[in-house]
């Protein structure tokens, strides 16, 4: 069992990484969690505009052009070869966000330092945990939008038609659904920026939760051009909201994956989904 030091109230963490068993991994975890929450509330209440980039090992492999996992051409972000796109847009863009989060895994923090010349502001686990315990929904009710893969946003919109699901989230609605390509977004990042920018220009949310894959390296920092808001990259937290999270992911252990009867899930690009904690609506 992970140490109390790394618990986030209202969640269960089944991630077995040894860093959660070492008090020296991140001694200020609880104190910085409160600072993070206060920081977000202040930013949103003051109508600030800022981007939070969540770094994962896949972003490292993408930025260093390695054929590993989701970063590999043909897997998710890119259908072309790395040589067929302008990688400088991604390597430079990844350094242009306002704040950075990264898991407390020491190996991921080492990878971050190799490709991004910025400091890590907060653990990425905060984003997962505050989706998992619904803090985001409680704190920013009526002000929160989503940016993510169209297929998962369509699914989330359907889930939000059910009172049981709205009660589970403690939320009546998301004020905006900003669609983003589920696959191959890095093939033509300028087209993606235009597509997303047109939607953002018409949006009303004060804070967006988002999960948009490795192409965010080039696109995330541009969002502020189209809409003043807080852009909070929660990565796999978007899979929680869509009811398809692998419960072994950090702080997703007791999340209920609500499922819709007769819904066509064949178009959903699952991220190692383990079909656990499912409940049919």
Q: What is each of the regions a protein language model found here?
A:
Residues 101-102, 146, 176-179, 233:
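Structural signal for conserved beta-strand scaffold positions within catalytic alpha/beta enzyme cores
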Residues 151-152, 214-216:
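Alpha-helix capping/helix-boundary segments
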Residues 207-211:
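Short catalytic-loop micro-motif centered on adjacent basic/acidic residues
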Residues 170-206:
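A mid-sequence, solvent-exposed acidic-amphipathic segment
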Residues 215-281:
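C-terminal functional extensions of proteins
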Residues 1-170:
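Electropositive, gly/pro-rich neighborhoods at or near active sites that engage anionic ligands
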Residues 35-42, 84-88, 188-200, 215-217:
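A short, acidic, amphipathic alpha-helical segment used as a generic capping/interface helix at domain edges
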